[in-house]
């Protein structure tokens, strides 16, 4: 059944009644980061990319360098999909440590096993563009872990220079 809310009692009943239960959170919209350059040609949203792949419209990423921002399961899905769509290099950029990622450990390990590079303690600052206005890189700032905020390690800028990751 689609589009149906489930409480704890009903979930227990479903587990007893069925061999498998699929729960989807229904995330249908993208989360903008507010980075300068995020509207540039060559910037693709996770939802749009994964929806296209689900519709068998595989993007041809042959020879391309791809940066994926985030440390959750969706970021791992996008990174692994980019590899499978022919990307030359996939870098996962995350502002905290790998151990702080919200993605399942198996998803992180799977992304690494498929050749994705995980750049921890790396905060995105801006999307750089080339002469034609297309994405050419991701400007990032190295981070260090500071005091926890709201129960999570709080990254803050390290005293090291910004750099640009080509993508």
Features from the language model and the residues they span:
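A Rossmann-like FAD-binding core segment of flavoenzymes
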Residues: 1-31, 48, 52-58, 84-167
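Glycine-rich dinucleotide-binding loop and its adjacent helix/turn
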Residues: 30-85
